[in-house]
Amino acid sequence: MDKRLLDILVCPVTKGPLIYDKSHEELISRSARLAYPIRDGIPVMLEDEARQLTDEELDKWKDK
């Protein structure tokens, strides 16, 4: 994920920052509790395509 793109993108629900999860190819929105998929290098920033994060997953990203 290009750092410049990550600096520009925000969560479409909360307008908050996103965290890149390289291992799952997702962009994480802690405030919305959503993970947006990245398909073929392109972030899919649609709420309907995002998956809900579990409490355990949120804890993983708490300090990032």
UniProtKB/Swiss-Prot annotation:
> Domain of life here?
Bacteria
In terms of Gene3D superfamilies, this protein maps to:
2.20.25.10
UniProt protein name = UPF0434 protein Tgr7_1374
| UniProt source species | Thioalkalivibrio sulfidiphilus (strain HL-EbGR7)
Give any Pfam family that matches.
Trm112p
Q: Which GO terms describe its cellular component?
A: cytosol
- Detail the disulphide connectivity of this chain as listed in its UniProt entry: none
Give the family per the record.
Belongs to the UPF0434 family.
